[in-house]
Structures are given as structure tokens and as C-alpha cells.
């Protein structure tokens, strides 16, 4: 028994006063296991641009994913993995199919929010639809979810160690250079971005508003990384994650935040490791591990984090061990008992290959490949079956990591490997020995097409990646588009969505339609619908559209105007065939003389008079041929006097169906409208995008002079920031008229929807579309899935991608050509509802 003065004092106090100077029990402590205790992060060194962690240091890069690969890709990756990393370093490659799609949807929503009105309502409805795709499949038959693929590459080294800050910086520069050589963009992931990434991994509940993760440099990173409102229950074969469902869902008209409930808020997180891999694997086959491109059933039903963890051991020891293995297996394979062990010969050959690769400069690495899935609670078993089926179809075998679920989640965190996780995995026998070139071939760096930088058309890839596409992202060539899709492929909806997308972003749109498919949508969007009939009384005199002063000062402008006017006159004179060289010369002389004499006050009558006064018989024949378009002729009223209207509206649709029986007039009216749009382009700012869309172009662009006219128009459009879009049911239709063929040949972009099988065979046989076997397979696989989505193949400068157009009920109601739908909307407006409210009611969404 130990006696002390304090004990004696307590005994005396207890005896005299029945009390002591100290409490009867020690003070209670709150004991909670914190997920942040597993994180390595401490501080960020701004000078060295390195993270200094508890037991390591390193850097983190965010990289654009690879879109496919080839042998060169594998060689470059293998070379860097073999030579660019020092001994003891730990490399992590994380491919995260994130449920946070706000970085794509937000910039697309912003310009439409600024436009307000119907375009803001369309954007809100589309945003809700895409966010719904995150957790609910957009297809009733197969998984189809929206995902934003993020590729994170991190390199860390243990501390203390022999690798200096300067060596790490050199590794970073070498890694960035290697990625740039593959055509990938890489940028440093700073603390704010790292905190956001950890939040996406540990709190996947998706709200419309992006959470702001401000980095406080005066506090440790680990204490800022994990939200305080999540709960993680660790099981033997899963993690049960509970998050806060009350999140900011948007802001009202006054800018005040609105907080709503976001579901799901309970998740089943499971981790798997690779048990076996195929004997042979190429870098481009990694695309199969993000979801099959052609089989809908083999797509991921939930967010996943795929990780490759590499540890670079002592190469001398590793080489010595490899040499021993080679000698041992070789000697055993040459014994008499080898016939009872047939795999000995294979093992000997494999170690011989390893020995040769090591002598060639390759390295042996310790490797771990795993996958973590994040499913809404209750769906984990169904999702596990699909995930394992995807890997099994590619020849891989996944196994549950029982009792290692938390370690699997931590393995997804950048820089965790060098901070002690590598030692844990080595102790648990989770690291396999592989060649560095093999590791490069299986690196999970594949993703889907990310789109361009101009947020016009919003599409979703087959594996779920939302992306933007715009014809104006082509900086090297023109912005023109050729669109083809068979009946029932969704072509009409795509055309209307293209126009609404451009208008919502502030562009000016003119449509020349044949069939009234745009009538209701243009009226609902506040545009102008113009019908051409013989009794309409419109004037389209091309001379009156020209700016006199500018034509006098700008020679290029004047020549472009003359070229189009001459093509219009040529179309009047020879509607079925192209004018001869002599006739072109006579028309040129007559148009020039008329302009010099009368300027913009001239008319087709004056050109006819000049032709009639020429000395040649051909000139008088031309004057007679264009007589129907002169005063007193059948169509003279359309081209007399000053043009009766200007393109002042941002969205205008010209309906030509009433002129279908008069093809000679329709082609001239069409060319006059195109000339009017070209003049509107020259008068507006080049920063404003402009689109002219012609539906059923093969029929509309018939005529002898239309080819020449379209070529001139395409050149003018490119110069003034405009685009010409033409649409037909088949690519073969473009070859039915000179004008349509000229439109195709002057289009750098092509959008192909579902086609007939025999049509695709014609493409290949007649070499009308430059495509290899893969492109042909992609086009053959295009489909439309009812009202769920329609697929479009985008082919353009350095671009080949498949996107799905996903409509919301609000947009589908606007684009509907059903007269009853339009009448119902008007009826709701008469009852006092706003336009957006009326559309929502008819669409079935209530107020």
C-alpha cells in the first residue's frame, strides 16, 4: 500500500467532514470515432505546392479522362511508370464517377437564367430532369444515370525519407508533361478542390446548388474535410452512410436561399478488390470497365470510385527476387516431375519475360486495384450484381473485401497510400507484384467525351457523362451542320432543341420549315411565325436588302452581295438546271449595271430590262425566263418594291409548305430569305451567334443555281459568326440536289440520328461518309427509346461522340406539334396562368 500526503489528507477530511477535496468519480469524456482521424491531410505548403501530411508529403492533380487509347498511349504511360517515379513513392489513380453534375449543368443553366421567361423555365425543368437521372434511371430497361467522371492522380512519399521537395516537383512536371503528350489537360488540385472531392466521396447526397468548400489555412485540412452531419456505420461487408437531407436547392426570385429535402440520404457503400484479371489486356480495353458502349445492361447503376494504388519498392531487392523466381521455376520445369505440374512451364516463361523486361529498364511495383460503389440503401445487392457482371464480361473477377470496407474507402482518398495505408495493405496481403508496364495498361484513366466550352446543346453520354456541344466551338473551319435521321428517330425534336438551346444562350435563329413542325414552339418562345402564300403580299426584293453605303466602302461585302443576287436571278431564269457560262456572264453584267445605275432601289424588273436590252439572243431568252418574277408576272408581287419586313426578331420561322406545289417559286423565295439572313448577319455584332436552319434541305435546295448560292452563303456565315444547318432523313438525300450537296460539302459538323441498315451500307459502299469499322458500328447502334431519349452521333473536327438527348415534360410540351396541346396551353393562359405555368399544367406538372 502506498501512502502519500494527499491520501492522508483525504482520509482525514473524509473522517471529520464526510467529504473529500476531489470528486468521487473522474470527469466523463466524450469518446467518438472520427472518420477524419483516418485522413492523412494536415497543411498545404504554398511555396512548394505540396501537401504536408502526418507521415508523408505529395501533390494531387486533376486530369481530363482519356477517350479511348492506342498502343502509343500504353507506351507513354508505361515509360513514365517505369522511369519517372523514385523509389518509395506511392502513386494513386482515382477514377470517380461522381453524382455531382453541377459543374456541367450550372454553366449551361446560367445564360438561360439571365434570358428569363420561357428559357429560364426550360432550363429549370431540364436541370430537375438531369438531377433526377443521378439516382433514378432514365430508362425503364437498363441503367442510365447522369455522372461526372473525375480523374485524380496523386503522388506521395513517406516522411522521413530520401525524396526531396525538388525531386517531387520534378516528378510533378514530368507527370504533367506526360499527360499533355497524351492530349490530356492536368491542373493542380488545391486544398479547396481536395476538400470538395472528399465531400463528394463521403457525402454523396446531391443538391442542385453546389456546396462551397472554403479552405481555412489556419486549421488542419483533416478537420475541414469531413462534414459533421454524416454518420458512418462500419459493417463486415459494407458501410452504411447517413447524410443530411436538408440542403440548399436553389434561390427564389429575390435571391434568397431555399432549403429543401434531398434524397437519397442513406447509402450502402461497398468495396471490392480484383481477384483475377485476363491474361492479356490492352490500354484501350479499359473503356469496357466504365460501362459497355453497346450493351445497355452493362452500365453502372450507381456512383463508383475505381482506384489503382502503386507502391515502388527497393528495385534491387525486387530484381533479385525476380531472378531467384526465374531460376527456380526454370530448374523445376526441366525436371522429370514437371509433367505432373503443367503450370510450371507457364510460370517459367512468365518469369523469363519479367527478367527480360527488368533488363530493358522496366520496374516491378506493388499494386492494388479496387472499386468502391455508393448505392442508395436497399439497392446495394442489385447494384453489386450488375457491377460484377460488367467486370466479368471484360474478363475480370471482383471479390468482396470482407472486413476491409473502411480501408477501401480510405484508399480512394488521394495521398492516403503513402501515409501508412500501403503498410496496412502489405500486411493484409492485398498488394500484388506486377511490371510497371502492366500497371500502365490497367490504369483506370478512361472516361466519356466531355464536350466543348460553349454551353449550347446539352446531351448525356451513354455511360452518363453530361456534356455541351455547339457548332461554334470549331475555331479552325466553318460552323455549318448537316443533320440526318430517319423518320421516327427524333430528328424534329433535335432540331427544335438545337434552336431553343441557341436562343436560350442569346443567339439569333432563323428556321425555314416545310411541315409546320416549328409553328407552336416558335410562338410559345415569343418568336415570329411567317407563312408564305400567294396572297400574303410579302416583298423579298434582294436589291433593297443591301446596305448602299457599306457596299460602296467594303469591296468584299459588295462582291458577296452580288454573288448571291446573281444566284437568285440565275435560279429565277433556270430553276431546273445550272446556267451556262454565257448566261452567267450576261446575268453578271445585267446585275452590275442595274446596281450601278439604281443601287438598292433596283428590282428584278430592272435586271430583266437590262437583259432584254442586250445584243445577244441568250440575254433576251433570260429576260423572258425571269418574266414570271417581274411586275405583271405570276410572282412579281413577291419581288417588287422595298422588302416588306426585316429580321428584327431573335427567333423567326418561315413556313414554306404552301409553296410546295410551286417549286420554281419556293427555291427563289428560299434563296431570298437566305440572302436576307446573310444581310442581318452583317449588320449584327460578330459576337452574337446566328443560326439558319433548313429542314428537308434536299427538296428545299433544288435548283440549278442553289449550289453556287449555298457556297457563297456558307462563306458569308463563317465570316460573320453564323452557321448554316441543314436536315434530311438520310445522308443520301444530300446528293439529290446541287444545293443540298453544296450544304453537305461545306459543313464541318455532321449529326447522325438513327438510320436504316441499308442506308448505312450505302454510306460505306459509296464512300459518302468517312468511317472505319468502329464508326460504322456506332452508327448502327443508334436508337431512340420512346420518350426517354434519342441518340445522336456527332462527327466533326477531331470529334466523334454519341450523345443522348433527354427531354423533360416541360420541353416536350413546347416542342409538341399536336394542335390540341397548343390549344390547351392557350386556354390555360386565358384563365390567368402565366405561359410557364400553363405549359406546366398541360405537361402534367401542375402549377
Could you describe each region identified by the protein language model?
Residues 50-56, 63-66, 73-85, 176, ...:
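Glycine-rich phosphate-binding loop of nucleotide-binding enzymes
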Amino acid at each position: 500500500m502506498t501512502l502519500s500526503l494527499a491520501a492522508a489528507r483525504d482520509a482525514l477530511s473524509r473522517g471529520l467532514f464526510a467529504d473529500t477535496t476531489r470528486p468521487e468519480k473522474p470527469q466523463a469524456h466524450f469518446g467518438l470515432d472520427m472518420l477524419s482521424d483516418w485522413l492523412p491531410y494536415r497543411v498545404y505548403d504554398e511555396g512548394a505546392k505540396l501537401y504536408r501530411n502526418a507521415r508523408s508529403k505529395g501533390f494531387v492533380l486533376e486530369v481530363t479522362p482519356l477517350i479511348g487509347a492506342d498502343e502509343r498511349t500504353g507506351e507513354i504511360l508505361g515509360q513514365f511508370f517505369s522511369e519517372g517515379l523514385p523509389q518509395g513513392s506511392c502513386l494513386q489513380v482515382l477514377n470517380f464517377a461522381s453524382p455531382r453534375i453541377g459543374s456541367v449543368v450550372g454553366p449551361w443553366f446560367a445564360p438561360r437564367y439571365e434570358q428569363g421567361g420561357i428559357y429560364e423555365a426550360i432550363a429549370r425543368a431540364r436541370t430537375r430532369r438531369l438531377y433526377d437521372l443521378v439516382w433514378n434511371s432514365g430508362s425503364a430497361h437498363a441503367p442510365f444515370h447522369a455522372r461526372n467522371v473525375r480523374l485524380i492522380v496523386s503522388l506521395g512519399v513517406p516522411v522521413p525519407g530520401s525524396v526531396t521537395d525538388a525531386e517531387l516537383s520534378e516528378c510533378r512536371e514530368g507527370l504533367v508533361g506526360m499527360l499533355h503528350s497524351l492530349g490530356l489537360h492536368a491542373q493542380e488540385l488545391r486544398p479547396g478542390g481536395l476538400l470538395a472531392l472528399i465531400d463528394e466521396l463521403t457525402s454523396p447526397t446531391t443538391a442542385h446548388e453546389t456546396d462551397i468548400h472554403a479552405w481555412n489555412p489556419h486549421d488542419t485540412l483533416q478537420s475541414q474535410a469531413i462534414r459533421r452531419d454524416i454518420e458512418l456505420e462500419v459493417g463486415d461487408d459494407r458501410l452504411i452512410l447517413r447524410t443530411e437531407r436538408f440542403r440548399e436547392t436553389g434561390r427564389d426570385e429575390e435571391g434568397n436561399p431555399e432549403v429543401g429535402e434531398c434524397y437519397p440520404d442513406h447509402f450502402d457503400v461497398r468495396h471490392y478488390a480484383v481477384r483475377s484479371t485476363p491474361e492479356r489486356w490492352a490500354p484501350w480495353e479499359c473503356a469496357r470497365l466504365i460501362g459497355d458502349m453497346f450493351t445497355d445492361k452493362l452500365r453502372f447503376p450507381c456512383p463508383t470510385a475505381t482506384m489503382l494504388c502503386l507502391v515502388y519498392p527497393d528495385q534491387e531487392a525486387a530484381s533479385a527476387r525476380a531472378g531467384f523466381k526465374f531460376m527456380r521455376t526454370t530448374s523445376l520445369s526441366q525436371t522429370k516431375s514437371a509433367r505432373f505440374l503443367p503450370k510450371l512451364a507457364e510460370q517459367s516463361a512468365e518469369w523469363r519475360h519479367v527478367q527480360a523486361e527488368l533488363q530493358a529498364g522496366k520496374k516491378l511495383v506493388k499494386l492494388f486495384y479496387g472499386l468502391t460503389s455508393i448505392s442508395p440503401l436497399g439497392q446495394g445487392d442489385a447494384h453489386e450484381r450488375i457491377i460484377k457482371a460488367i467486370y466479368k464480361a471484360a474478363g475480370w473477377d471482383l471479390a468482396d473485401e470482407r472486413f476491409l470496407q473502411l480501408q477501401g474507402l480510405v484508399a480512394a482518398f488521394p495521398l492516403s497510400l503513402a501515409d501508412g495505408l500501403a503498410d496496412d495493405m502489405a500486411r493484409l496481403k492485398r498488394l500484388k507484384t506486377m511490371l510497371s508496364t502492366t500497371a500502365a495498361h490497367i490504369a483506370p484513366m478512361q472516361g466519356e467525351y466531355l464536350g466543348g466550352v460553349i454551353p449550347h446543346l446539352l446531351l448525356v453520354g451513354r455511360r452518363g457523362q453530361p456534356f455541351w456541344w455547339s457548332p461554334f466551338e470549331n475555331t479552325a473551319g466553318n460552323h455549318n451542320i448537316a443533320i440526318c435521321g430517319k423518320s421516327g428517330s427524333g430528328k424534329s425534336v433535335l432540331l427544335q432543341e438545337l434552336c431553343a438551346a441557341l436562343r436560350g444562350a442569346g443567339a439569333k435563329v432563323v428556321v425555314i420549315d416545310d411541315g409546320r413542325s416549328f409553328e407552336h414552339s416558335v410562338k410559345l418562345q415569343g418568336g415570329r411565325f411567317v407563312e408564305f402564300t400567294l396572297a400574303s403580299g410579302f416583298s423579298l426584293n434582294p436589291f433593297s436588302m443591301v446596305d448602299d453605303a457599306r457596299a460602296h466602302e467594303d469591296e468584299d461585302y459588295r462582291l458577296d452581295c452580288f454573288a448571291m443576287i446573281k444566284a437568285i436571278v440565275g435560279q429565277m431564269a433556270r430553276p431546273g438546271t445550272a446556267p451556262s457560262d454565257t448566261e452567267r456572264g450576261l446575268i453578271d453584267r445585267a446585275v452590275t449595271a442595274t446596281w450601278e445605275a439604281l443601287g438598292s432601289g433596283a428590282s428584278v424588273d430592272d435586271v430583266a430590262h437590262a437583259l432584254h436590252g442586250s445584243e445577244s439572243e441568250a440575254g433576251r431568252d433570260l429576260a423572258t425566263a425571269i418574266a414570271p418574277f417581274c411586275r405583271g408576272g405570276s410572282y412579281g408581287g413577291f419581288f417588287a418594291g422595298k422588302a416588306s419586313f426585316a429580321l428584327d426578331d431573335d427567333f423567326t420561322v418561315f413556313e414554306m409548305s404552301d409553296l410546295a406545289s410551286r417549286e420554281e417559286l419556293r427555291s427563289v423565295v428560299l434563296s431570298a430569305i437566305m440572302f436576307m439572313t446573310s444581310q442581318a448577319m452583317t449588320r449584327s455584332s460578330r459576337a452574337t451567334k446566328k443560326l439558319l436552319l433548313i429542314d428537308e434541305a434536299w427538296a428545299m435546295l433544288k435548283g440549278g443555281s442553289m449550289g453556287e448560292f449555298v457556297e457563297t452563303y456558307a462563306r458569308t456565315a463563317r465570316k460573320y459568326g453564323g452557321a448554316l444547318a441543314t436536315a434530311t432523313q438520310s445522308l443520301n438525300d444530300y446528293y439529290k440536289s446541287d444545293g443540298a450537296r453544296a450544304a453537305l460539302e461545306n459543313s464541318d459538323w455532321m449529326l447522325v440520328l438513327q438510320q436504316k441498315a441499308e442506308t448505312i451500307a450505302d454510306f460505306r459502299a459509296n464512300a459518302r461518309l468517312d468511317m472505319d469499322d468502329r464508326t460504322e458500328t456506332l452508327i448502327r447502334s443508334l436508337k431512340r427509346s420512346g420518350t426517354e431519349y434519342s441518340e445522336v452521333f456527332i462527327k466533326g473536327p477531331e470529334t466523334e461522340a454519341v450523345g443522348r438527348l433527354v427531354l423533360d415534360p416541360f420541353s416536350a410540351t413546347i416542342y409538341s406539334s399536336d394542335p390540341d396541346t397548343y390549344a390547351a396551353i392557350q386556354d390555360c393562359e386565358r384563365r390567368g396562368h402565366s405561359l410557364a405555368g400553363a405549359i406546366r399544367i398541360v405537361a402534367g406538372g401542375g402549377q
